[in-house]
Amino acid sequence: MSVFLRGVLLFLSLLGTGGHSLASADFPWQKIDEGLEYKSVRVDGLPYQTLMKLTILRIGWEQFQVRILDSRDHGVGRMEIKALTRKAQALAGINGGFFLPGYRPLGLLIVDGKEANPLRKADWGIFLVQDNLPRIIHTTEYQNGRNISQALQVGPRLVVNGRELQMKKQIARRTALGLTLKNQVILLTTEDTDVYAQDLAHIFHLPEARGGLECRDAMALDGGPSTQMYAEYKDLKIDIPGGWGVPNGVGVFKRR
């Protein structure tokens, strides 16, 4: 078979599968520890609108926990995620919610059971840990009850109950959080690439067999210059800096 014919057949096969079927095989998960996996993904071509370079952590809830990090707990209004992660003695961290001028948090924050910032009436999502289980809900579903140890309000939501939502046509650097069907937590940042929110929703929604993250629910966190990720644990080292410090983030801790 000629090189030209092989190229034509490969092109047709990619069109027939939506252009993303190779992602799962080409970018396998790397096991860092029991319950902690990492992968770096580069996706280009249909059905995505732009090149995406993604850094992703998948966190098993039985072995690890996720907690909200607040810079004010360390005496400052903002910190780079690298510094905040280290200060909190987390093994990994990403940036969190929106903020006002002066780096004042915008939206609900609950840190280790204490409300650090009030709920905002907005069409956003809330990541929370209630009764030691992770959830993503809409603002209107929130009830200030007991047994909520962590909460972060931000948005928009990308996937709801396994359904990909329609996003505004906006492009930026992105940070996002998702929950898989197995209650694993996904932490994702883009690296050196601007991404459409719809493409991000699509990859969170798609099954793993088609190169996706197979999430039941997912939401965007603050993006643009706020986007950043840091991890230092065993053989894993990630350092994706942002454009400025942030008031809060999401940290990963090993259960004892």
Task: Describe these PLM feature segments.
Residues 1-7:
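Positively charged n-region of N-terminal signal peptides that target proteins for export
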Residues 71-74, 139-145, 190-194:
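Short, solvent-exposed aromatic-acidic interface loops
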